[in-house]
Amino acid sequence: MKTMATRKRCKLSRTGPEFENVIKRLLCARTFHTRIGGDLTHGIINRGRRANAEQMGLQGSAQHFNIFPLDLWTQGKKTEVQKREGTDSIPAAGRSGTANQPSIAPHRCLFSRGITALDGLKRGRGCNGAAHLVRGDAWKTKLGEPWVSIALALAGPGAILILELSWFLG
């Protein structure tokens, strides 16, 4: 049964200004699936707090995911296992063929968060919280072809919120 807060959060008008807060709408969704068959709902609801391997639908030992997995890809932090083994590799996080994936450059972190595009300018916040502006389609080249972005049309003629779910989608 939904709580009062969940009910209120899920009753958003598609034409009203509150619709721009797409994160609230995403939190209403029951399930997010990945290609590896994982259920991402709990990982999204955690909103940056610790998520275990089971919550994220990942294969492998839970000790490899002792912090929110996105941090491993965006900030290059080492897990306790990496520190103990003296390795710079990052756990594959359920992906095939990426057992020794190196740390991804910080600019990818910017595009792993919500980004608002208005009049050709992409606005977002990087891992360090600093605001960034990227003109045109530069974000596409930085992310690379395998990454998938979901664009949602919002209220207003030029407003688009791009929610980067590519890390989860593989």
From Swiss-Prot:
Subcellular location: Membrane
Keyword 4Fe-4S: no
Any one annotated GO CC term: membrane
Membrane topology annotation: Single-pass membrane protein
Major place of residence: membrane
Keywords: Membrane, Transmembrane, Transmembrane helix
Transmembrane residue ranges: 150-170
Protein name as it appears in the record: APRG1 tumor suppressor candidate
Record gene name: APRG1
